[in-house]
């Protein structure tokens, strides 16, 4: 797969040899919010680590992630839980994975730290989940309409990444969900099948 062929902006902005690419995701579908108490019990955290003002909610732009907000980055960084227990819980909700998110405004700019665990591992950059998070942030007023948010992921597994996300709100609908980031070419060649 050629990154440039699948993105809308690939080849445009370059920074230190890296090129920025952005992809558009499907319009989101929002599931029924989950109980703070149930989720806190399943992932083994104190319920007061979960903000009251934002729901824990399954969101899909193709693959369903349960967006689980955290009150602070330290609690998110310290997170350790049983993936098997969480997977059993998520199966009942229709979601595939949790996407743990801690959004914060810093100097007027919205940034977020995120984590995504799967099958015993941790993913350093989950674009499909980041699009769901962008949709969730716009839907619940965490992010402004079409505001670019930088999501840092992979810090705790020592593979830090940055994804730039945004989405628009048109009436009751969230649309134009975009996920982008910088990439560097590490290999070029031809594959003959």
Language model features with spans:
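Active-site proximal loop and beta-alpha junction motif in alpha/beta enzyme cores
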Residues: 1-193
């Amino acid at each position: 797969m050629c990154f440039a062929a699948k993105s809308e902006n690939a080849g445009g902005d370059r920074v230190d040899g890296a090129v920025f690419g952005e992809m558009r995701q499907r319009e989101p579908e929002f599931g029924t919010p989950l109980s703070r108490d149930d989720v806190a019990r399943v992932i083994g955290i104190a319920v007061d680590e979960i903000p009251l003002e934002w729901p824990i909610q399954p969101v899909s732009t193709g693959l369903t992630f349960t967006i689980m907000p955290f009150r602070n980055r330290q609690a998110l960084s310290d997170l350790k839980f049983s993936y098997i227990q969480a997977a059993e819980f998520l199966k009942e909700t229709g979601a595939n994975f949790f996407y743990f998110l801690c959004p914060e405004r810093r100097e007027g700019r919205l940034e977020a730290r995120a984590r995504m665990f799967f099958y015993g591992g941790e993913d350093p950059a989950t674009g499909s989940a980041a699009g769901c998070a962008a949709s969730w942030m716009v839907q619940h007023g965490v992010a402004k309409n079409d505001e670019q948010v930088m999501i840092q992921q992979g810090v705790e597994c020592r593979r830090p990444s940055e994804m730039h996300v945004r989405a628009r709100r048109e009436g009751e609908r969230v649309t134009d969900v975009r996920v982008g980031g910088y990439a560097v070419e590490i290999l070029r060649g031809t594959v003959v099948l």
